[in-house]
């Protein structure tokens, strides 16, 4: 679909579901994203005093292949009822995506007519809308080598789909692609605070290297010594994502070096409420998680254990340690340090 055709469709939808609609409102939109609200009907009978429940915030990502592939919806909530609604939307989208080539062609032929028909809707103000010339391409600000990685992932996904060997979910894959693009644009990534590498080109399995920590910390000094001894000057993390990401957190563990302190558990798991279902939010970005882990290691006075058995860090042991600590904290709660402690 052309940019003008997509813009025409979105503008038309925004004119129908405006900010005064009684049930569903498009708060703002861009060519690749919608920010919407669903106003939940109050549970009390009409006429009785009540406070209306807060609206549900929904996000819609429009992929490059639209309309051949359906938009991806996600919500900033861990409510299982909302998750089931999204699953039903996925089923509906799959059924509706089997249209014929003639229908797609017909839609393309109607784009220009629609654009002309709704020119009079230009007076509607959308806070996030910008002139086309000023809009950032989703690839803007990304280095060529990283664009090549993104393109390789897209090609692999298409080939897997054709071969019937699709892994993961559409929802998780689209969100992870967005996270990866955001990381590639990030100044923290570009300045070498951390790096990201996909393991075996899998979108669901990442190696993250923490390459810069607080220079005044003992951990920084340890990493300098480690560089001299072993040629390693980073902390290697493994991020594993499930099909229901972003509604479940990634599983994160330290791969190397062996650390003491810093809330690092046996096997390399991390004792952080942020990485549990209880403390996780689907609104969190992966970069914010990476930066929080970096800060937590320093705050927890992590130190490199020189000469330690490197085989003690593995996935099975990390998962065991993680599950044990989560059970303990579910019973006893999590300790929140004073604000002055960061």
Curated annotation (Swiss-Prot):
It comes from the Eukaryota. It is an enzyme of class 2 (transferase). One of its GO terms (biological process) is protein K48-linked ubiquitination. Residues 171-335 form the UBC core domain. It catalyses: S-ubiquitinyl-[E1 ubiquitin-activating enzyme]-L-cysteine + [E2 ubiquitin-conjugating enzyme]-L-cysteine = [E1 ubiquitin-activating enzyme]-L-cysteine + S-ubiquitinyl-[E2 ubiquitin-conjugating enzyme]-L-cysteine. This is Ubiquitin-conjugating enzyme E2 Q2. Keywords: ATP-binding, Cytoplasm, Nucleotide-binding, Transferase, Ubl conjugation, Ubl conjugation pathway. It is found in: Cytoplasm. One of its GO terms (cellular component) is cytoplasm. Accepts ubiquitin from the E1 complex and catalyzes its covalent attachment to other proteins. In vitro catalyzes 'Lys-48'-linked polyubiquitination. InterPro entries: RWD_dom, Ub_conjugating_enzyme, UBQ-conjugat_E2_core, UBQ-conjugating_enzyme/RWD. CDD domains: UBCc_UBE2Q.
